[in-house]
């Protein structure tokens, strides 16, 4: 007859057996799982994704780059313009302009990050609020931020003497775009409004710059319509502090390709044609040449949303706005080549107080 003690001992022995069997099978399952995982990793190596380099992949690469000081920044705060230049590479794709307090906040962020020079451009910067918005930004940058240099690029057609009277003291450099000293050529290019004389505006603004002590500069885009022109006599007479000579540039989505507002292919010249133009004008000491490569890599460009634009791939890939992520994060994706910036003479005497000009 089995006693109660014997039954209890048998029950305990059975429980121990069951636990040992469970432990054995759990260990076996873990071992098998590890073997299967290891085999899977060996059989399935990490895939290399083969696709064209995208903005996202470039941003990952950019995130490892050291911080770039934004010493000179070009702020295209509006895309609107009253001219229709056929090769324009910053076209009127939006009508957006930041509220002025937001624009000022972004400019302060840039100053805190090391900005010394701000250049306002467009579009045509005098279009918005008839130049008063631009004037207040110029005033803010010189008075409040105390930037060494504040400059503007304009076509000159909308500038009035009253603007110089109010804001001229705070502006260091005014660059006027002029591609030809032949009126018919300017009309063909689109550097005109109706039948008004672009050259008359150029000379008028030049005289105001002398009167109100603003350094005068000329920007010219060399293209199929003006590449054979000799501008030596006219540039010498106008005597700008700098004559920037650009090779006509194609930018996908702006003046070339699908969804572009311009078709600039017919304006494009070869590198040799550009070099011939430069050699024809080599006697002009203030000439600063800019080939396509220099233009793509050596400018810090902010769009109307205060996003840096990376033009290295022949298109404009935007960063996030400095208003959202700050300058240090956004500038990683600007595509900016500081060495090229210095090679093209990007850093020069850019404060009118240091230019020792004869007004």
UniProtKB/Swiss-Prot annotation:
Record localization: Endoplasmic reticulum membrane
Induction of expression: By interferon type I, type II and LPS. Induced by infection with spring viremia of carp virus, presumably through type I interferon pathway.
Cross-referenced Pfam families: Fer4_12, Radical_SAM
Topology in the lipid bilayer: Peripheral membrane protein
Record text on cofactor binding: Binds 1 [4Fe-4S] cluster. The cluster is coordinated with 3 cysteines and an exchangeable S-adenosyl-L-methionine.
Ranges where the record places region Disordered: 43-67
Keyword tags: 4Fe-4S, Antiviral defense, Endoplasmic reticulum, Immunity, Innate immunity, Iron, Iron-sulfur, Membrane, Metal-binding, S-adenosyl-L-methionine
This protein's record includes keyword Iron: yes
A biological process from GO: defense response to virus
Domain of life where this protein originates: Eukaryota
Family assignment from sequence similarity: Belongs to the radical SAM superfamily. RSAD2 family.
Physiological role: Interferon-inducible iron-sulfur (4FE-4S) cluster-binding antiviral protein which plays a major role in the cell antiviral state induced by type I and type II interferon.
Protein name in UniProt: S-adenosylmethionine-dependent nucleotide dehydratase RSAD2
